[in-house]
Amino acid sequence: RNSSDIFMDYQERFYTEVFFPYLLKNNIKQILHLGDYYDNRKTINFKALNHNRKIFLDKLREYGITMDIILGNHDTYYKNTNELNALKELQGHYMNEVNIILDPTVMNYDGLKVGLVPWICPENEQQCLDFLESCDAPIIGAPLELKGFEMSKGMPCMDGMDRKHFDRFEMVLTGHFHAKSSQQNIHYLGAQMEFFWNDCGDKKYFHVLDTETREMTPVHNPLTMFEKCFYDDTKESFETISN
């Protein structure tokens, strides 16, 4: 969020007070990131890079945690190709901790196969569709823009990819949209924290997938960035309630 100190402090609290403590307590050593690691697809400054390294990437190394990450649309410089992307350019010093998924592939997590699909663009669209037809994994993870799902609370996506391509899978886990929602086998996990005002009041989670039972557990992030204050302006003013 434009390297705002307010947002960076908020995100640091999430990682230090919520996310990493939960992983350490439950001995979780593997993260699967479904895309959109960075915010601005065109540029990022040194302040944001330094902050991200200290509060997240260095912690992966310190705690012995690895992360598989799929390209999201915010990670790619161009809209018609994924070739130039922030993940390759900026995470080269963490290759032991970070595995960047550039092409559709099947990963094996403790015996559970998960098909991972990067952001679908004109250049890789046919490759991704062919993969979805032949993939033998029961679960798909991908940053998807599917018609009929909420992008943010109360704002449905009126265009986008048809969900029929995913009908044969047991479970589809996707990011991209900020709102958490589910329809049949497709689960939008939503953002794990608040980024915009339309996130206000919409509970945020990260999720834990049990590779044995295939059960998914949402873990609530209690930290918020935005709050709405309601008051009777015939009796109070904003100044009085803020004091």
Label every model-predicted segment:
Residues 210-243:
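Accessory, non-catalytic peripheral segments of nucleic-acid enzymes
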Residues 152-217:
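Conserved beta-sheet core of the metallophosphoesterase superfamily
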Residues 75-164, 192:
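Conserved catalytic scaffold of divalent metal-dependent phosphoesterases
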Residues 28, 62-67, 167-170:
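A short helix->loop->beta-strand "cap" motif at the edges of active sites that frequently abuts
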Residues 1, 39-42, 68-81, 107, ...:
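Active-site environment of divalent metal-dependent phosphoester hydrolases
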